[in-house]
């Protein structure tokens, strides 16, 4: 028996572990392990949980319709998920496990524990890197060290992609028939525990089908204008695919391949190259997170900035959280985040700089607040963005760089 272990890759397309597992002719089953306690420990937003759980429901139906069973277990936290997986493997007679690698520190520790236990039982584990375009340890400077400046990383990243010329992951050889969705009620019960406002559920569309349709519409209608429109929060100039990429309902490779042909179009080239650059940023922050695991413990990338003295003014922090600073653009952005689970990237930078460089409040408090509300919450990107804005991170903005958030003769006051 072969097992496909789904994690943050809730899709059937562009999924190498699924394709490889089904290529061998052996029986295949699939598994996802819920870890609500780990979500609590990581401060994952209810909006993101809602998006993931609904995407999981769609995945279970899609797999079953193609003849593959999906089992959903409750592991509690990552330690519990190791035991749940070990027991499931023994009960089902699994001899091989196929999964995509995950790179944050806690996930790495979980997977190392899984490898020790399963390999001791003679179970083989096959890991793949569908969560990125370039694996975190693939690129190095001339000195053999990780890239810590994005511009240099991007040049090497482009060379890698040009040389590789990746193609789409082949479609799985589905067994046919009707599979089972075992544990659907666990997912539904988990959804019942969430309190997510209608302003979030009306805006976001979980699942692989929605993600693929949204990608198609963006590439056909907006990709060419992306560079010109992306920096204006009042315009719908972004792809809106961040939640899909975060939950893995869309493969980064599929996003890249959809945009790549536009690089040969004189009118669309700049927009395509700029958007592909955002996929490179995503890989960059993942390799930073992977190569510098202390970031997962709350450490700044630049050690000297650990000496910074931050303000502990709770009144100012709450005003920022609630959109009551008196700076209209900052307040509008923060209210957008709370009400919709999302904020335009330019506004993420602006509000982060406002908190850290106007109010002198620790970036980690802002980082946690964002994660508690973002539907696209992603540790690598969120941590990287906050440290960049606070000038504590890799390739960081200069300490004196502050985004202009308000222009007026009279400075407003926090109330």
State what each model feature region is:
Residues 296, 302-307, 349-394:
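Active/binding-pocket-proximal capping segment
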Residues 120, 262-268, 295, 340-343, ...:
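Secondary-structure transition/capping motifs at alpha-helix termini
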Residues 1-164, 335, 381:
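Trp/Phe/Arg-rich N-terminal binding region typifying the photolyase-homology
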Residues 286, 321-361:
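C-terminal substrate/ligand-recognition segments
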Residues 59, 282, 286-330:
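Aromatic-anchored, charged helix-turn/loop surface patch used as a conserved interaction hotspot
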Residues 270-275, 345-350, 365:
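Alpha-helical scaffolds flanking conserved acidic
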Residues 123, 144-300, 409:
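Glycine/tryptophan-enriched, flexible segments
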Residues 408-415:
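Single conserved hydrophobic/aromatic residue that forms the stacking wall/gate
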């Amino acid at each position: 028996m072969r097992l496909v272990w789904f994690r943050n890759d809730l899709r059937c397309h562009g999924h190498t572990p699924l394709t490889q597992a089904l290529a061998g002719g052996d029986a295949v089953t699939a598994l996802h392990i819920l870890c609500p306690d780990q979500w609590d420990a990581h401060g994952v937003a209810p909006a993101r949980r809602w998006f993931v759980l609904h995407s999981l429901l769609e995945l279970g139906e899609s797999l079953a319709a193609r003849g593959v069973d999906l089992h959903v277990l409750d592991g509690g936290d990552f330690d519990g998920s190791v035991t749940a997986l070990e027991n499931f493997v023994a009960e089902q007679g699994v001899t091989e496990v196929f999964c995509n690698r995950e790179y944050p520190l806690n996930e790495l520790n979980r997977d190392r524990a899984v490898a020790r236990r399963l390999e001791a039982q003679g179970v083989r584990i096959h890991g793949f890197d569908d969560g990125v375009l370039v694996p975190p340890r693939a690129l190095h400077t001339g000195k053999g060290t990780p890239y810590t400046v994005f511009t240099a990383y991007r040049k090497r990243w482009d060379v890698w992609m040009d040389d590789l010329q990746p193609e789409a992951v082949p479609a799985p050889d589905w067994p046919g028939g009707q599979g089972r969705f075992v544990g659907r009620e666990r997912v539904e019960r988990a959804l019942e525990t969430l309190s997510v406002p209608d302003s979030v559920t009306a805006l976001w569309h979980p699942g692989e089908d929605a993600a693929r349709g949204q990608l198609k519409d963006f590439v056909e209608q907006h990709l060419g204008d992306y560079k010109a429109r992306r920096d204006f929060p009042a315009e719908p100039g972004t792809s809106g695919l961040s939640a899909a990429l975060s939950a893995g309902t869309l493969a980064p490779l599929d996003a890249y391949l959809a945009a790549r042909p536009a690089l040969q179009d004189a009118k669309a080239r700049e927009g395509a190259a700029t958007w592909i650059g955002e996929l490179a940023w995503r890989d960059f922050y993942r390799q930073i997170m992977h190569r510098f695991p202390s970031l997962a413990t709350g450490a700044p990338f630049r050690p000297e900035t650990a000496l910074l003295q931050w303000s502990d003014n709770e009144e100012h922090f709450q005003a920022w959280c609630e959109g009551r600073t008196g700076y209209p653009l900052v307040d509008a952005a923060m209210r957008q985040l709370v009400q919709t689970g999302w904020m335009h990237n330019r506004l993420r930078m602006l509000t982060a700089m406002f908190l850290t460089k106007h109010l002198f409040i620790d970036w980690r408090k802002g980082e946690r607040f964002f994660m508690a509300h973002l539907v696209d919450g992603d540790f690598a990107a969120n941590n990287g963005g906050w440290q960049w804005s606070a000038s504590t991170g890799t390739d960081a903005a200069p300490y004196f760089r502050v985004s202009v958030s308000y222009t007026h003769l009279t400075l407003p006051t926090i109330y």
